[in-house]
Amino acid sequence: MTEQAEDALPISFTDAAALKVKTLLDEEENDALKLRVYVTGGGCSGFQYGFTFDEKVNEGDFTVEKQGVQLVVDPMSLQYLVGGEVDYTSGLEGSRFFVKNPNATTTCGCGASFSV
């Protein structure tokens, strides 16, 4: 799937998330890496979010670009993430990527798992 106008995207990511991805890519010295977001079964609420760096974009993957970096989501995960936003936070509890997901009916305390 190709990039679309930002207001029509099924998932987006914040400037903070894009900046952190860019920083990590610069450290790795590999501009081919993309942030892949996925959903798997598990966690205390039924589903959990996962983040990894990947050089490949598979057939059917959705990609969106911001500040020169790409976010990639597989079709199965995308159905649970429509309308969501990937963000990055750094604070007293540590630093992490997280998903603001309007489809989640419940989330765990740490925000890493959810149910729909």
Curated annotation (Swiss-Prot):
UniProt key word Metal-binding: yes
| One annotated GO molecular function | 4 iron, 4 sulfur cluster binding
Q: Does the keyword Transmembrane apply?
A: no
Gene3D superfamilies under this entry? HesB-like domain (2.60.300.12)
Q: Which GO terms describe its biological process?
A: iron-sulfur cluster assembly
Record's cofactor remark = Binds 1 iron-sulfur cluster per subunit.
Record family assignment: Belongs to the HesB/IscA family.
State the function annotated in the UniProt record.
Answer: Required for insertion of 4Fe-4S clusters for at least IspG.
Which named protein is this? Answer: Iron-sulfur cluster insertion protein ErpA
